Amino acid sequence: MFTYSSNECGAGKTRAIINYLNKNPSTKGILVQNTMALMTQSSQSLTNCKVINTNTSTTVYEDIIEYIDSPTNQVLVISDKMFWKVGESIKAGMYEVFVDDSTSHIEHTSITEDNTRAKGIVQYDILSNVQQIPNTCFSTASIKDSKDYGDLMKDLTKKFDIVRNNDACIFNTSWLVEEETTKMAITAYKNLTKYSHLDIHFCANNFEQTLIYLANKHFFVKKDLDGIMTRTVPVQQRLKVFYFSDSDLSKSWKDKSQDELAKVYRYLNKVLPPNSFYWTKNNADSYKVDGVERFELAGHFISCDTRGINSMKGFDTCVWLACLRPSSTEIKQYEHLFGISGDELLRAREQETLWQFVMRGCIREFDSDKVQTVYVFSKEQAMSISTNIEKIELDITEKRKNGRPVGSTNAHILPDALNTRLKRFLATNPALAEFITWRNEKCKGISIADSKVMMTRFEKRQKKGGAK
């Protein structure tokens, strides 16, 4: 079993861990943190520690392995990325491990490619053990050893490090078998059972809503840290939130509505004095007119992921124009793997990241009553932060309501002969590889639409458990 504590941003979680370790010099500890800056900051307060990261070593993995077998200091400070790599090698009972504000053992990425030859290279030369998951539209796979590959193949294989660096993964089968599917969505994760022999304490804001907790509730028992601070003024009394749209913000809306989004940027650049606020947007947000970037504000830009940043406390205003909403495929993969709902994923992904971003400002000071002003795009984002919200009317065109697009056509129907052949073959309960081979060899010359319908029929049969 692991222990955890759940305390709000700025409550002194890191300080409490450091105080515990300094007061118990005979305790061997490992402090796991997610930024170089935080690791350096913590090392300055720890009485007897060693930091091993890319700033202090050229052979990080090897040095950590050597240290955990023969420690030279009381406390080892390492990154969360390295902890997941070496954790299985740490001996039981030797260390108390503190995972500070690192809240996910899951990774998700997408790869966009429509070239069928490239897809074939991925399927046959990079991935191995591709297996369709019964009753789903997903497959699992591992990755082949690339040590004998040339430079080009090694570079291509690096695109799939998410598979190599985790214990298991799933992806949408359609990317391999449907020409018109251009995006491969991969979700991969660490198996926490590998670390169950260790004494690990996790701490974070709203830990019960983090992905690592939601996916592994059976592993965790709550245990509070000593010395946690309390606010003099409740956080909700210190927030004023403005928003611009009643519709949810999405990447597709940004791509299609750049002129509408530009209205928000123009307004904020008009009302906010330069350098009086910190702000963020998605890395992909860019819209240049005559070489001038329209999606730019005159504040202090920081990334969306702000865990560990303590240098924004002098600002009383911040702007969040990012969108971190999960895709429908990602939601389905999380539901299948961990039983995590779309709402839970949205809360853990976008809304918690937004909350962390807001908590970098003056509101981080617990003994202050100063109000922090926050600007976000959507009402949904605003309501996830506070009830004290107000809409700024900029005449932004809202999203269309869901419904069948004008001019859409009826579903594609297979020719009778092909439909009969497909029924007969599906009755044999083929595996994914058998189905692909049959379709490619026995159904040459079929259209993309036919191929897509056949794959959909195969997946539906898999979900039903095959023929009775």
Where are these regions (language model features)?
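Walker A/P-loop
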Residues: 2-17
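Conserved Walker A/P-loop ATP-binding site and its immediately adjacent core
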Residues: 16, 20-21, 25-47
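Conserved RecA-like ASCE P-loop NTPase motor core of nucleic-acid helicases/translocases
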Residues: 27-35, 200-204, 268, 275-283, ...
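Inter-Walker segment of RecA-like/P-loop motor cores
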Residues: 49-84
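Conserved RecA-like P-loop NTPase helicase motor core
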Residues: 77, 85, 105, 298-384
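SF2 helicase catalytic motif II
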Residues: 91-128
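Interdomain helical connector at the RecA1-RecA2 junction of SF1/SF2 helicase-like NTPases
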Residues: 117-275
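Arg/Lys-rich, glycine/proline-spaced intrinsically disordered segments
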Residues: 399-412, 460, 466
